[in-house]
Amino acid sequence: FVSGLGSAWIGIGLLVGALFNWILVAPRLREQTVHYGNAITIPAFLANRFPTRSMSLRTVSAIVIVVFFAVYTASGLVAGGKLFESAFSGIYNFGDMSNYGMGVMITLGVVLIYTVVGGFLAVSMTDFVQGCIMMLALVIMPAVVLFGEGGGGFSQASQTLNEVDPTLLSWTSGLTFIGWLSAVTWGLGYFGQPHIIVRFMAIRTLKDVPIARNIGMGWMLISLIGAVSLGIFGRAYAIRNGLDIE
C-alpha cells in the first residue's frame, strides 16, 4: 500500500521460507518428537532431547519464548482494542474506560478462556477458523476494490497508480540489493517461530506432513496474492474515491 509492488518481495521470501521449513524441519521434528517422549512444548522437547541439560534448556527456552511472545501477543491485543474502538466508538459508553481499553480487555478475556478451557486443540481450532476468515477476506476484498463501485478495473487502477507514482507498479525501482535481500530473508524467521514449530510437533503422523504442507502452502499462496493485490489496488481505490490513504 505504501511502498508499492517492491514490498511483495517480502511475501515471496515468506513463501519460500515457509516451504523450506515444511521440507527441512517438519518431518524430522515430528519424527524426533515421537522418539523423545511425545513432548508437546519446545522446552519439554529440548529437555527430553538433551537430558543432561534439561533444567537449563527448559529455563532458557521458556524465558526466551515468554519475553519475545509478550511483544507478539501485545500486538494482537492492540489490534483487538483498535478494532473494538473503530467498530463501537460512540455507540457504547464504558464510563472511565475507553472503547479501546475495553476492546483490549475483551480480547484478552476471550483468548484466556478458550486457551485455559480447551488447551492446544482449542487454539488450533480457533487458528483454523481465523485463517479461513482471513483467506476469504483476502480473496473478496481485492475483487471489491477492483470491480466494485468506484473500482474501475485493472486498467483504471494501473493508470491511477502510474499518475501518482510510476514506481508503485515496479518490482525493482528504488530497491537496493540490501533492501531486496532484507525483504526476501524475512522467511528465515519461520525456522524459529515457536507457534509454528509446535504445530509440526502436533501433526498426527509423519505421513500427514506432506498433506499438511500442501494445505498450508496453498492457503499461504492464496492469502499472499490477495494481500499484495489488496495493498496495491486498495491504494488506487482510496485515491480514486478521495479516501485518506494515511
Spans of model-derived segments:
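Small-residue-rich segments of transmembrane alpha-helices in multi-pass membrane proteins
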Residues: 48, 130-144, 218
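Juxtamembrane transmembrane-helix termini
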Residues: 27-34, 82-92, 121-124, 144-154, ...
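Membrane-interface helix-loop-helix modules in multi-pass membrane proteins
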Residues: 1-38, 177-190, 196-241, 246
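Membrane-water interface regions at transmembrane-helix termini and the short interhelical loops
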Residues: 2-5, 82-86, 109-130, 199-205
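Helix-loop-helix junctions that connect adjacent transmembrane segments
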Residues: 91-98, 143-185
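Helix-loop-helix module between adjacent transmembrane segments
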Residues: 9-115, 185-189, 223, 231, ...
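Hydrophobic/aromatic positions within or immediately flanking transmembrane alpha-helices
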Residues: 11, 101-104, 124, 134, ...
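Membrane-interfacial loop-to-helix junctions in multi-pass inner-membrane proteins
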Residues: 42, 55, 59, 124-128, ...
